[in-house]
Amino acid sequence: LIAFHGQSGDIMFQGAKTNKVQDAFDALNELGFDLGGAGPAVRTSMSCVGAARCEQSCYDESRAHRQVINTFLDDIHRPALPYKFKFKFSGCANDCMNSIQRADMAVIGTWRDNMRSDEGLARKWFAKHGMNELVNDVVARCPTKAIMLKEVKELRTGDAAAHLTSVKVSDTHALEIDNKDCVRCMHCVNVMTGALAHGTDTGATILIGGKRTLKIGDLMGTVVVPFMPLKSDEDYEALV
């Protein structure tokens, strides 16, 4: 019986007799398949589709995934750790891999410069959705109150606006985003995709220790590296 196993992405062979497991293991190895990934070992890791097709991707997830897994491949085959260990790679804070609460080491895409904006798309969005949705679903839901709705004439300019992202939604009103207060949660980008976008100085945040248990619930990972650039070969090598 073969089962494709959910979050781990493994093919599981269930119901084998104990005295035949090693024979099956050896035979599949000879065919070129990797085996292992269960018990107190490095588990099968996962990365989102990311850079292959998603505009929100902040680094090359599959490359980072391969770099890390190739380094620790031997630890996947046989249980050799005190407890299981999982790596997961998400390209942005939407965290499609659930890495923040389902991985011992999570690599989540982020950026450290100002957000980008597109006035044409912002005006189209506003014309379609209106003021109520802009206020209730964008401005009011910013977790750090980094977004303000202003009249165009009140927008800050010059050196005082170096840390701001401003975009007109109409001839009279505009959004002003204080990038110093932004926590890169992706909510406004998700709601106004295209009109707002992540910055160009991208990389990843690395977290340790996320897990999910029935007794306690989600325990989010702890940030150990707030920002790591992931652009050059040296950057990806630094992951390991």
Where are these regions (language model features)?
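Small-residue-enriched alpha-helical segments and adjacent helix-cap loops
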Residues: 1-135, 141, 145, 155-159, ...
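Non-catalytic, well-ordered alpha-helical scaffold segments
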Residues: 22, 201-203, 237
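Short coil/turn segments at secondary-structure junctions
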Residues: 52-56, 226-227, 231
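A structural signal for small-residue-enriched, beta-sheet-centric alpha/beta enzyme cores
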Residues: 116, 128, 136-139, 143-144, ...
